[in-house]
Amino acid sequence: MIIPEKFKVAGFEVTVDLVDKTDDNNYGYWDDVNNTIVIAKNISMKNGELTPLSDRQIKNTFYHELYHAFQFYSGREYSEVECNIFANFMLEFDETKKVKV
């Protein structure tokens, strides 16, 4: 899967930023003020060492934050559990789909 740089949700442009690491050391976050999904490429361990995230972790984080954008634009409350579930569903779909052209 290729992580998009930009796309639209509910007519609003959303930007995706891949960063070395987030300020709060999360895997990523949805910024509803700036319509931005921020995804970390690395996580800082307790000893301060940076550990790279796998492609699978980055994809899962993208889907998780995308669902937060869906929740925001549909007027629903944010739910970490719901976002985790749908991110895992989408990752499984993405990894197992067979394409017909």
Predicted regions and their residues:
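Glycine-rich loops and low-complexity Gly/Arg-rich segments
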Residues: 39-43, 63, 96
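Short alpha-helical catalytic segment bearing the HExxH-like zincin motif
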Residues: 57-65
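C-terminal charged interaction modules
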Residues: 77-101
